[in-house]
């Protein structure tokens, strides 16, 4: 007997997801840049096909080299939609594979607390303090991902994200090395993977 696509009207859902990678990323990296933070994602859907998504979080990145140390610290917000690509054969199926889009913004503070110089002008071993400043950034994202129900109402998720910077404020003398929620803006684009755990209410 051939399986039939489930045509029963599916109930809507509200799902809260927590990013698994951001809180521990800095502990497993030996790179000069140490990143930490957290992120939560809220999904709302009426029919398991179109999901309205709101994501919010904070990131802090400390970058240390021989000549200077800089910190980028701030909040970010994303809003958009996911479209489920799955066709269900059983109304109990809740796994999804989706594509999506986001519009995103971040407000953050950039600090250069230590700028070490050895020169005939500044003297040997002098430290110059550059005042901190507040910045904003706006970008768009494309998303491809999946969420799989591992036990009732509990989901593990992963998604691949590509982002394009639309605008960010910057001082010409001191380049921003990290935008919270985006990454390094110097090339104008960013690509990364998110892993999350979520609960359906």
Question: What function would you assign to each model-found segment?
Answer:
Residues 1, 37-45, 60-65, 88, ...:
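Generic detector of contiguous secondary-structure segments
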Residues 16-22, 55-64, 118-126, 173-178:
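Flexible, solvent-exposed coil segments and beta strand-coil junctions
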Residues 2-45, 55, 198-201:
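Short glycine/proline- and aromatic-enriched beta-strand/turn motifs that initiate or cap beta-hairpins
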Residues 14-16, 36-40, 75-79, 83, ...:
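Hydrophobic, lipid-facing positions within transmembrane beta-strands of outer-membrane proteins
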């Amino acid at each position: 007997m051939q399986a039939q696509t489930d045509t029963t009207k599916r109930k809507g859902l509200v799902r809260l997801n927590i990013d698994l990678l951001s809180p521990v990323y800095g502990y497993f990296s030996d790179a000069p840049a140490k990143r930490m933070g957290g992120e939560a994602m809220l999904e709302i859907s009426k029919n398991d096909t179109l999901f309205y998504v709101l994501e919010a979080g904070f990131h802090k990145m400390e970058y240390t080299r021989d000549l200077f140390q800089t910190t980028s610290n701030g909040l970010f917000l994303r809003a958009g939609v996911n479209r489920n690509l799955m066709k269900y054969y059983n109304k109990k199926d809740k796994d999804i594979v989706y594509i999506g889009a986001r519009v995103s913004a971040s407000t953050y503070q950039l600090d250069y607390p230590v700028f070490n110089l050895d020169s005939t002008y500044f003297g040997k071993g002098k430290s110059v303090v550059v005042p901190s400043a507040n910045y904003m950034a706006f970008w768009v994202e494309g998303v491809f991902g999946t969420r799989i129900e591992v036990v009732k109402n509990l989901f593990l998720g992963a998604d691949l994200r590509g982002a394009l910077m639309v605008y960010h404020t910057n001082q010409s003398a001191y380049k921003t090395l990290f935008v919270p929620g985006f990454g390094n803006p110097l090339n104008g684009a960013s690509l990364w993977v998110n892993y999350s755990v979520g609960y359906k209410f």
